[in-house]
Amino acid sequence: MKKNKSLISFLGVFIMLFSFCFQGNVQADVNTVQSGKIKSGNVTVWEVGNVAKVLADVERLNLNTVNVPIQVDIPNVTSTNMVINQAQKQQAIILIQELLKRNIQVIVEPFPYIQQGNVGETEWNPSNINDFFWNWKTVILQDIFNSITSKYNVYGLKIASNFVNMEYAEGYWSDTIDFVRQQYKGNVLYQMNWWLTASWDPSYEAKFVEKINRPYLKKVDIVSIDSWFEVSEKRNPSYEEVKQSLFATTVYNRGQNVVQQLEQLHKATGKPVYFGGFNVPARELGLQNPWNPDVSNVFSKNVQLNGWRAYRDVLEPKPYFKGFSIWFIGSNDSTHAYQIHSQE
């Protein structure tokens, strides 16, 4: 017994020394990530300065990509005025530099920060669509071209983030993509918000069909989804129950076939499909309202684990599926529902 304790002590010291030697040179091991796939994490606009924690999460979660947001300050939900927060952008650039040093791919996302972050981006409904697109291109995207994409090897650029009230403007988006292509040679991503359909209401299906057949989606490289599908109403669904629910959701008996709809999206656009923001809160009912980290005050690691396992097992083998981005990484709040609480 004494010998074993000595051996354990020696190994512990060795591991600590080994870790110390490699501090500051975090290199994600991406060997388990399939070639051409993305295994990413999203950083929030207020945590881009947590460089050490972001790098630690990249290593812990074996990521090959990080989604770095650039804060776009917007005074209210109907505003067409917008400006990049330069102080936050400088922090983001430092993070980008550190990630690229470690061969971690970077996706840049101009992120709408409405009313000091008190209003979600899906609520943005500009009063003048022409002014919105002019400022989005010449004030926001142009700043990103000048200060980031022209200077750093950026893997991807999200040109939209859940703009549900602007996605109808097909000609404007087509023009925006052309504008982007003139100055940026990396991957152009359009990120749409998740959607609902219900077998008992055909109007939802009609909206979905309209959504996936927007002509401009064929002009981007990757179609990204902020993915918070309401899958299961059970407090603690098993792995098999979650898996089955991806083909027929049980919340309000909607019967939404998420997997089939993702394939429809791919076929309509001809583009890979990517979950550009995804997680399952480690709470009971976490798969009923995954967009709500406070859906329940009862912690459940199994809900998160079963949710992730089911999604990965179903979607990762699909050739059209590009990968996941974890919402979120880089946070020092160890008890948050969106922290990944399992080693798997």
Locate each region found by the language model.
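Glycoside hydrolase catalytic-domain groove-lining segments
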Residues: Q88-K89, E109, Y184-L189, N213, ...
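Substrate-binding cleft and catalytic face of glycoside hydrolase catalytic domains
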Residues: L61-S79, Q90-M166, V280-L287, W327-D333
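Sec-dependent signal peptide cleavage junction
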Residues: F18-V30
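Aromatic-rich peripheral "rim/lid" segments of glycoside hydrolase catalytic domains that contact
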Residues: G286, P290-E344
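Short, acidic/polar
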Residues: V45-E59, F133-I148, W200-R214, W308-V314
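Aromatic-lined carbohydrate-recognition surfaces of secreted/lumenal glycan-active proteins
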Residues: V108-P112, K158-N162, Y168, I177-F208, ...
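Boundary/entry segment of secreted carbohydrate-active catalytic domains
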Residues: A28-L63
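Substrate-binding cleft/loops of secretory-pathway carbohydrate-active enzymes
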Residues: T176, W194-D226, E230, R283-N289, ...
